[in-house]
Amino acid sequence: MAYQISATKLQTYHRCPQAYQFRYELGLKTNAFFGSAALGTALHQTLAQAYRDWHYQEPLPQMNWLLDCWGQHTDSLSPAQAEDGKQILEIYYQNFIASEVAIHKPLAVEGKIQASLQVANLEFAIAGRYDRLDYLDNGLELIDYKSTKEIKLPKEDEIDLQIGLYYLALEQRYRQSLRKLSLIYLRTGEKVSFDATPEHKQLVETVIGKIAWQLRTDCDWEPQPGEQCVSEA
């Protein structure tokens, strides 16, 4: 059976091999694992529906289109959350729809990508999720919506691993290269983009190779003390 790997797993291993062992080999989960965000889920579903179901016969949808979609995903929200979400969508509309000449139908919305990699006679099943995949002139842009109240950019080495994993998976799935990974912070209307290169793919292959070696040799998963110990312990 293939060994499951994801961006979160790679980032955990990079931070601390022993934390990886505790969480994924021994099944010990942190309290944060059980968190849930109904408002964030509703926003993601609304934007997925808005881009998926828009007819694209006109250059741009009206704001009412987003609100119609929003109304279909608010049943589990409080009135305050529903109003908060409406304001967030208004910010999104002004920054990412009304400011464009036209919007184009994405390759896909709110989906999963899967790929495989063979290392040291071990098969790794690579899995990831995305909010939207857009076409670029020379490849693909993967868009990830963030509904957190604070803008917290990922560390450079961790975003590099995420980019590399998606690069590898999208190349297998669509035969196209990832050129850009973009984070859209819904509450502020800010977009942060990272270029994707073949070097990111090579980085992920190297890290997966290290995991394969540890699994094969059954050697100690060395701890890497740091700030992650507070949340992983």
Predicted regions located by residue number:
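RecB-family 4Fe-4S metal-dependent nuclease core
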Residues: 1-233
